[in-house]
């Protein structure tokens, strides 16, 4: 034949995995990315719906109880790798939001998104943790998303949004006193004992785990 159909590419491992974690954001993502690209009037609403679905279902990435560091580190690394497709999906939508000058009308939705996922970094009473390593994978995910958020805003010269972020007071609905009911973007930067302890036991140590 004149034109030979190319062979199918390799299916990503995360799709074939039997126990893969899914956030159920596919439909909301496609709708949001389409509305943003087409300049639809309800594009901001579609973005808000996607961010809400994402933050609500991110809870599925929380790790189960574990009392052994090596086992916890293995689960930690697996969850980080499994999250990559969803991080990339989230980033792609954010890039399109910035390119289409929609960051101003979706800024509050993004702030509520970060408030929601920040709750997953808090210690759960019903879970037994490895010493000082509670919710480290969620802290890593949150920190990475915040860094990416700032980077994309800067790359697209959304300087007003960056300034607003740095001046925003986030609301902690679990706060008990006037001192912990609000917090700033600095709360999204975490020291991860999981990677620190693993680095201490490794033959080749990294100078900076956050760089």
Annotate the PLM regions.
Residues 1-2:
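Conserved beta-strand-loop-alpha-helix hinge of the TIR/SEFIR fold
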Residues 9-211:
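Long, low-complexity, intrinsically disordered terminal regions
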Residues 5:
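Acidic, PIN/NYN-like endoribonuclease modules and their adjacent C-terminal/linker elements
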